[in-house]
Amino acid sequence: MDSKGSAQKGSRLLLLLVVSNLLLCQGVVSTPVCPNGPGNCQVSLRDLFDRAVMVSHYIHNLSSEMFNEFDKRYAQGKGYITMALNSCHTSSLPTPEDKEQAQQTHHEVLMSLILGLLRSWNDPLYHLVTEVRGMKGVPDAILSRAIEIEEENKRLLEGMEMILGQVIPGAKETEPYPVWSGLPSLQTKDEEARHSAFYNLLHCLRRDSSKIDTYLKLLNCRIIYNNNC
């Protein structure tokens, strides 16, 4: 690797280390949102939002880095993007088209959408980690990010359930969420088709993590800061 490539890699590693240390200091990474369980949560709504916003932003950063790494390693010149457009398993969710539409959406709807997106990714993230582990020559940068995203997605889901309970006391999220059915594509013996399936999944993860991050920041601004941010 040339000196420029080494410098860029070193910068990325330093950035990840700084972010990880920041999250650890804030009690976000490796610590449950409510250490004593959801029924004994003493964390304020403001703190819940602060932690959730940090985790969602972190997940989106990891998702973008993982997608870019996979694209560079496996997708150059393959045209996978044309097959990935509008083919996410969460496309059936009626999400706002852009930030402006999201700003006009009621906070209960935004919370329901965030919860639906997070729950819909539990299964694919589990299988993503399993299948990436079995790939030949997969970069550690992809596997480590996949593992971390799966863990952080669970923590963010827990945090959002706590937020829902404080914003709407007694509320229970019962809305159905999209079910992923793409495992056979990740396990096919056709390497080209398998790489295309991985590309599509990572593309969708990056897209949905961006939506979650946007909606959560809007909710934080609206509920905690009364839109004064």
Curated annotation (Swiss-Prot):
InterPro entries: 4_helix_cytokine-like_core (IPR009079), Somatotropin/Prolactin (IPR001400), Somatotropin_CS (IPR018116). The keyword Lyase does not apply. PROSITE patterns: SOMATOTROPIN_1, SOMATOTROPIN_2. SUPFAM superfamilies: 4-helical cytokines. GO terms for molecular function: hormone activity; prolactin receptor binding. This is Prolactin. GO terms for biological process: female pregnancy; lactation; negative regulation of apoptotic process; peptide hormone secretion; positive regulation of cell population proliferation; positive regulation of fatty acid biosynthetic process; positive regulation of gene expression; positive regulation of lactation. The modification Phosphoserine is found at residues 56, 64, 120. Residues 1-30 form the signal peptide. Prolactin acts primarily on the mammary gland by promoting lactation. The keyword Secreted applies. Gene3D superfamilies: 1.20.1250.10. It is found in: Secreted. One of its GO terms (cellular component) is extracellular space. Keywords: Disulfide bond, Hormone, Lactation, Phosphoprotein, Secreted, Signal. Its main location: secreted. Interacts with PRLR. Belongs to the somatotropin/prolactin family. Disulfide bonds join 34-41, 88-204, 221-229.
